[in-house]
Design a protein with these regions (language model features):
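Long, charged, low-complexity intrinsically disordered regions
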Residues: 1-77
Length: 77
């Protein structure tokens, strides 16, 4: 997991993260950086990683948008 800022937007890169870690990492990232929304989560090409990330966001009623395949932008908590 890596976080970085690009073009003024904070990103979470999930490359190398194990599937069972996704829920906690995504939720902590969003809550810690909620004052910096929009945020971007990079899931990569893994269908499973994208699904796990979206499930976490949906469960916690966090609004998001697919920017393109493997990239999710958090819009609102």
């Amino acid at each position: 997991m890596k976080t970085f800022v690009e073009n003024g937007i904070t990103h979470l890169d999930l490359h190398g993260v194990r599937h069972h870690e996704v829920d906690d990492l995504v939720l902590v990232f969003v809550l810690r950086n909620q004052d910096l929304i929009p945020l971007v989560i990079i899931c990569g090409n893994s269908v499973k990683m994208i699904s796990l990330t979206k499930s976490c966001l949906d469960f916690n009623a966090i609004k998001y948008q697919d920017i393109r395949y493997g990239l999710i932008r958090v819009e609102k908590i």
